[in-house]
UniProtKB/Swiss-Prot annotation:
Chemical reaction(s) catalysed: tRNA(Pro) + L-proline + ATP = L-prolyl-tRNA(Pro) + AMP + diphosphate
Subunit organization: Homodimer.
EC number(s) per entry: 6.1.1.15
Record-linked Pfam families: HGTP_anticodon, tRNA-synt_2b
Protein name: Proline--tRNA ligase 2
GO cellular component entries: aminoacyl-tRNA synthetase multienzyme complex; cytoplasm
Recorded name of the encoding gene: proS2
Annotated compartments: Cytoplasm
Length: 471
């Protein structure tokens, strides 16, 4: 009798496969309150690596980290009408504290534009105080009616950047820099994710923004996932909070602002873009464990060689874990590491010891081959870089093969329903066509210029709408 698969095959039931993988790879579990989640150590380790890589890129822009309160006075949300209207259905409101009803209810932050702008208005007085560049790593709460681990949860972790500038051009350019040189660079070069950079339509724009730049990725089932956004806020929040500065000419001027964010949703994207029927495939540059060295048997000589090999690979600059457990069968351990997507397994048994070799299993391309133990430290860094490039290439090939250029709304709907993306001239689709797409569970993920670059305006000549079903 054939052995039952560990995971539901993706082709049979993609949502079930996703939930199976989250569970079996020990990434997360459901929390006790609907829509919340417990991020398990392996899943949180991925988030920590994302934080490390992102934080370094954010700080290169001159942005500094800070932290603002979780609770926001409800009155703050009335100061920017579009913003509060956009978030009203998702708000969690605290009405009691210390056993008493609060004089003013407090909102659990859905995002921090309001409270951060209150402090910006105090901190910015002169042109010398600009630009003001702040980021925070935090949790936010947006009440979710249809939760799915990592993709849509009531509470999630993220980073949110907030900046104030003296001119429109400076703010616009900073938002674009975050979009391309922080987010896209991280997603392509660390996560090995193929992303489309574009601008949101007015319908999809962030509440209170004048322009939203987005990064959209195609998942394994052809649906789109928004991976991160960078917003030009214009002077909307500055006007609401009277955030002004004294210019060099001695005039009081309103600041120009941006905000931008990315979340633990990227872990869900990692699963759906790179995972296969055997589990996760973690990009080597991201992986908290790039190489796991396993003992096939609990022989003392084998265990000693496994530990020695682990030390040599660590000395070569690799992130290594030694699995020398003797109370768990080797086959079970190998399957567990495959599920977790560790890029390379180095397996050592008594026969390997005699031959001076190890069996090397590469998770991303698949397959095993014997490699001399003495050659591992020299060969594995190159193999890991090859596998990093392979993941990105596979993601790009998937999108290219499942994206079609169309000329009618009907063709766009058909492409999205079939698990693909469609590119249609925005002049053909327009806002009326965008509304029609919604009736078929599809949406405009972003607008791109004819050459694939980010357009400077929604109605720029030649703009193309990227249409898909989305998470």
């Amino acid at each position: 009798m054939a052995k039952a698969p560990v995971l539901t095959p993706r082709a049979d039931d993609f949502p079930r496969w996703y939930q199976d993988l989250i569970n079996k790879a020990e990434l997360a579990d459901n929390g006790p309150v609907r829509g919340t989640m417990v991020i398990r150590p392996y899943g949180y380790g991925l988030w920590e690596r994302m934080q490390q890589e992102m934080d370094a890129r954010i700080k290169e822009t001159g942005t500094q980290n800070a932290y603002f309160p979780l609770l926001i006075p409800q009155s703050y949300l009335t100061k920017e009408a579009d913003h509060v209207e956009g978030f009203a259905p998702e708000l969690a409101v605290v009405t009691h504290g210390g056993g008493k009803e609060l004089e003013e209810p407090a909102v659990v932050r859905p995002t921090s534009e309001m409270i951060i702008n209150d402090y910006f208005s105090k901190w910015v007085q002169s042109y010398r105080d600009l630009p003001l560049l702040i980021n925070q790593w935090a949790n936010v709460v947006r009440w979710e009616l249809r939760p799915r681990l990592f993709l849509r949860t009531t509470e999630f972790l993220w980073q949110e950047g907030h900046t104030a500038h003296a001119t429109y051009e400076e703010a616009r350019d900073f938002a674009a820099h975050i979009h391309r040189h922080v987010y896209a660079d991280f997603m392509e070069n660390v996560l090995a994710m193929d992303v489309v950079l574009g601008r949101k339509t007015a319908k999809e724009r962030f509440a209170g923004a004048v322009n939203t730049l987005t990064l959209e990725g195609m998942m394994g089932d052809g649906k789109a996932l928004q991976m991160g956004t960078s917003h030009e806020l214009g002077q909307n929040f500055a006007r609401a909070f009277h955030t002004q500065y004294l210019s060099k000419e001695g005039k009081q001027e309103l600041v120009w602002q941006t905000s931008w964010g990315s979340t633990t949703r990227m872990i869900g994207a990692l699963v759906m873009m790179h995972g296969d029927d055997n589990g996760l495939r973690v990009p080597p540059r991201l992986a908290q464990t790039q190489v796991v060295v396993l003992a096939i048997k609990g022989d003392e000589a084998v265990l000693a060689k496994v530990r020695e090999t682990g030390d040599r690979l660590k000395a070569a600059g690799l992130r290594v874990q030694v699995d020398d457990r003797t109370d768990v069968p080797f086959g079970r351990r190998a399957v567990d590491w495959e599920l977790k997507g560790v890029p390379v397994r180095v397996e050592v048994g008594p026969r390997d010891l005699e031959n001076g070799t190890a069996m090397v299993a590469r998770r991303i391309p698949g397959g095993k081959e014997p490699v001399a133990l003495d050659a591992l430290a020299a060969l594995l860094p190159t193999a890991l870089e090859e596998d990093q490039a392979l993941l990105l290439r596979q993601a790009r090939e998937r999108r290219a093969s499942r994206t079609s250029d169309v000329s009618t709304i009907e063709e766009a709907v058909e492409a999205a329903a079939g698990g693909g993306w469609a590119r249609i001239p925005w002049a053909t689709l327009g806002e009326r066509g965008e509304a029609e797409l919604a009736e078929h569970a599809a949406s405009v993920r972003c607008l791109v210029a004819e050459d694939g670059s980010v357009p400077g305006a929604d109605d720029a000549p030649g703009n193309v709408a990227v249409v898909a079903r989305a998470y």
